[in-house]
Design a protein with these regions (language model features):
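Function-dense linear segments that define catalytic or interfacial modules
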Residues: 336-341, 403-434, 450-457, 611-695
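Conserved "right-hand" nucleotidyltransferase catalytic core of DNA-directed polymerases
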Residues: 231, 235-351, 371-374, 434-631, ...
């Protein structure tokens, strides 16, 4: 079996990888998506081709001989995006640690290096595989030289392999004749002119018959069509020059040795260290354990009562410890503790019971010990009494979230990576989909390490994280808003909300009835039955059978997304019914069917509230997601009827009125808007009067609704295009509305522009309470990304401040309910609404608390206002 060499086109593959993967950065902000994509492609082909030799060629900055021949060569190419440019030296560094030779040479391109080495390797008896995203390299294909072209398709990256015969089959010409084809058709990406009016098909036809540009010119009178003949005659010299530019050199004077390209380890210790630094975790699987040289954390495990007592005694003296719970209450395996002496797992066994460990945790707090955890809420679910000592509990997960709210997770491995520079195996890698308590005994060695990380990481990261929090001036935000919110969310999770099963079933039946009715209506109007849920079948019905406009065909068929259907709905009743059908089937699967799965033995749903998910600071929920319960359509709102209070209670709901607009008025300092709120004016009606040029008393409900869209659209940085879509008006009209709006409220325009300018300079915006929202999109080389970043800069301070205020209100309301020994409790927070399950004889007190605490949650230049409703279901209370 002969040796095989694989030659990679460095810049071409790096470019393809950059655009094929979403932006990725490590903790230091280094972009890594192109590096990761390049390595994925390379390692995949190493596995498939099994080469014995490997090298990579890169272009250089200096002009090449082609630029000298034709100064406009590649003259139309845009500069490389900064995010890609910075990864070129990084990629070379990675290849160096993997002991893969890199070849570059001034005056020539990587293509010429690949052509030269490919030819010499073939002559030396190698099988050759050349990998590039550039089809120009097809001219290098022979019977022993294969050109591999990775292509991105809907199913992922696929590879087209070309030997000499494959090129001939595809184009009807040989690889050498392919150069003549390029000479005729030109190459827009390289700014090679070719012959005007001759495209790929005509070029292939001419060269297939005449084999070269020169021979075709010798038979110029035979060339068809006439336009191609005339143009070839006129631009013959340009065609020859283009052919010359397109020809890859195979005789460059290069300094290299094949033995240097022989594949060795690839996955060296140096490579592993660099992969760790770049956080290329998905590639760690390629390394042997000896290359990883991971330090195993020294952990002591014990179930001996005497040893555990000594452990707690030692921690009391130290005054500070990291704490993690191994498992959940009722199925706990023990606790993990780290302090200055080391890490110990106190495991349940003998006299060391779950209750004993809970008592000892509380005892530590009573003695003044500071406990550092990854998740304070999880600790509350294990031992509720710790909330009495909240000032001694530090939640490193929340602190890390405040410092970088754009991450997807803040578990021990994330914090260890970002602050301790350690790459630790994640819970998922160790436990799969199972909980730690399920696998603890079966794989004790692995899970002991993981359990140790639960206390080791927060303990050692805390000083670094908290210091950074102080540097960013978010200590107060953490201490007065975020940490107190944890216990409030815990209470909401613990209480839950009752769902009436019979009402839920009735709701589901109601949906089924309407869905079936819609199905029949749609089939009648379509003239046939089909799968309404199939975009492909639906597209054929709408755009081929019914000949509707706005047809937009993709590789997968006609697009039937909501934007297109909403354009058609006013004129086509079948489309309105399809949109309603989609909404109702989603309601059925998500709520009518979905909610039933979450009802627990107590008849309640105990949704999980998340504090570390959104970039703006807003809360979210899951299992189930109660934040997304629809309110715009009647059947969507009706789902609230299934949520009921316990016997003897009613629901009291309090909803902030226009909180984001009030925050905007305060932060922008716009006197016109501030004055309107202070005098209790109808803001939307006032805006309609000013923007649409209508006397205040003549503003219709429709105009008021349009003004409302403008008001809230401005808060979210809406564009003229976006507003035109919302109001179904021309972009010009929308632009005029926005301009009139800013003329009416000039302070808002100044404020929003100031936010964008600040964000471009600093890379973030801040809320009134100091919460930071990073906006990396503003430094992107992509125009769409930058535009998105500008919209984020406009609205994040407003959204984030509103989120901060609702958290302050939640904490204050919950605290007052407890301080006044009321049996009523806060059970839900949805956007700007608080829902209180209220004892019937406590309605008056609860209303008073809501008014005082919600309206007093922030001291703004405009008053905060709330709307209070009550009822025997959530629907009635809204």
């Amino acid at each position: 079996m002969s040796d095989k060499i694989m030659l990679l086109d460095g810049h071409s593959l790096l470019n393809r990888a950059f655009y094929g993967l979403p932006d990725l950065t490590n903790a230091e902000g280094k972009h890594t998506n192109a590096v990761l994509g390049f390595l994925n492609i390379m390692l995949r082909y190493v596995e498939e081709e099994k080469p014995t030799h490997l090298l990579v060629a890169f272009d250089r900055k200096e002009p090449t001989f082609r630029h000298i021949k034709y100064k406009e060569y590649k003259g139309t190419r845009k500069p490389m995006p900064a995010e890609l440019h910075e990864q070129v030296p990084l990629m070379k560094e990675v290849l160096k640690t993997m002991e893969i030779p890199i070849i570059t040479q001034a005056g020539i391109e990587a293509d010429d290096i690949l052509g030269t080495i490919g030819k010499e390797a073939e002559e030396a008896g190698f099988d050759v595989a050349i990998v590039s995203g550039d089809r120009d390299l097809l001219q290098l294909a022979t019977k022993k030289v294969k050109v591999k072209i990775p292509k991105t398709k809907a199913s992922g990256t696929v590879t087209e392999d070309y030997y000499e015969d494959d090129v001939r089959e595809l184009y009807g010409v040989s690889p050498t004749e392919f150069i003549d084809m390029k000479g005729l058709m030109g190459d827009a990406s390289d700014n090679i002119p070719g012959v005007p009016g001759i495209g790929e098909k005509t070029a292939a036809k001419i060269i297939k018959e005449y084999h070269s540009i020169e021979n075709a010119h010798d038979h110029i009178e035979e060339i068809k069509p006439a336009r191609a003949k005339n143009n070839l005659q006129e631009y013959y010299e340009q065609a020859i020059m283009s052919k010359d530019l397109a020809t890859i050199k195979k005789d460059c004077d290069l300094s290299y040795d094949f033995k240097d390209a022989k594949i060795g380890t690839l996955f060296t210790k140096e490579a592993y260290q660099l992969f760790k630094e770049l956080e290329l975790k998905s590639l760690f699987k390629y390394f042997d354990e000896e290359e990883k040289e991971e330090e195993t954390l020294e952990v002591v495990t014990t179930s001996d009562l005497g040893e555990v007592e000594n452990l707690f005694s030692s921690i009391k003296k130290s005054g500070q410890a990291g704490l993690g719970v191994i498992g959940v209450s009722g199925n706990c395996k023990g606790i993990s503790l780290t302090w200055k002496e080391g890490t110990v797992l106190a495991l349940i066994g003998g006299f060391v019971t779950e209750d004993y460990l809970k008592e000892k945790i509380v005892e530590l707090l009573k003695e003044g010990t500071e406990l550092i955890v990854l998740d304070y809420k999880a600790l509350l679910h294990f031992v509720e009494k710790v909330r009495e000592y909240e000032s001694q509990i530090q939640d490193v997960g929340i602190q890390a979230y405040l410092l970088n709210p754009l991450q997807s997770a803040y578990d021990y491995e994330d914090i260890a990576r970002d602050y301790l520079r350690q790459m630790l195996p994640s819970r998922k890698e160790i436990c799969g989909k199972k909980a730690i308590e399920e696998v603890f005994e079966a794989e004790e060695e692995k899970t002991v390490q993981m359990a140790a990380y639960l206390s080791y990481v927060p303990f050692h990261a805390y000083p670094l994280v908290f210091e950074k929090l102080k540097e960013q001036e978010m200590e107060e935000l953490y201490l007065t808003i975020e940490r107190p919110t944890v216990a409030t969310l815990y209470e909401m999770e613990k209480y839950g909300i009752t769902v009436e099963k019979d009402a839920l079933k009735e709701y589901g039946d109601q949906l089924i009835g309407r869905i079936e009715e819609l199905e029949q209506n749609i089939y009648e109007k379509a003239g046939k039955t089909f799968n309404i849920n199939s975009p492909k079948q639906l597209g054929v019905i709408l755009f081929e059978d019914l000949k509707m406009p706005f047809a937009k065909k993709t590789k997968m068929g006609y697009s039937t997304n909501a934007d297109i259907l909403e354009k058609l709905a006013p004129d086509y009743p079948i489309v309105s019914e399809i949109l309603e059908y989609r909404q109702l089937t989603k309601l059925k699967s998500t709520y009518a069917d979905g909610l039933a799965a979450f009802i627990q033995e107590d008849g309640k749903i105990h949704s999980i509230f998340h504090q570390k998910v959104t970039a703006t600071g807003r809360l979210s929920s899951s299992d189930p997601n109660l934040q997304n319960i629809p309110i715009r359509m009647p059947l969507g709102r009706a789902i609230r009827k299934v949520f009921v209070p316990d016997p003897g209670y009613v629901f009291v709901s309090a909803d902030y009125s226009q909180i984001e607009l009030r925050v905007l008025a305060h932060m922008a300092g716009d006197e016109h808007l501030i004055d309107a709120y202070r005098h209790g004016e109808d803001i939307h009606r006032m805006t309609a009067s000013q923007v649409f040029g209508v006397p205040f008393e003549e503003v219709t409900p429709l105009l008021r609704r349009s003004a409302k869209a403008v008001n809230f659209g401005i808060v979210y940085g809406i564009s003229a295009f976006g507003l035109s879509q919302d109001l179904k008006i021309s972009r010009k009209e929308a632009s005029e509305y926005i301009n009139k709006y800013f003329a009416t409220y000039p302070g808002i325009k100044t404020y929003l522009d100031g936010n964008v300018a600040f964000a471009k300079k600093e890379g973030y915006v801040k809320t009134l309470y100091g919460r930071i929202r990073p906006i990396p999109e503003l430094s992107s080389s992509n125009f769409m990304q930058r535009s998105f970043g500008e919209r984020v800069a406009m609205n994040s301070s407003i959204q984030g401040t509103a989120a901060d205020i609702i958290k302050i209100a939640m904490v204050r309301v919950s605290k007052r309910l407890q301080e006044e020994n009321l049996e009523s409790r806060l059970i839900l927070q949805i956007h700007d609404e608080l829902l209180i399950e209220t004892k019937e004889n406590e309605r008056k007190e609860v209303r008073k608390i809501l008014e005082e605490e919600m309206m007093g949650a922030a001291q703004l230049k405009v008053p905060l206002s709330i709307d209070i409703e009550e009822g025997k279901t959530w629907y009635e209370a809204k």
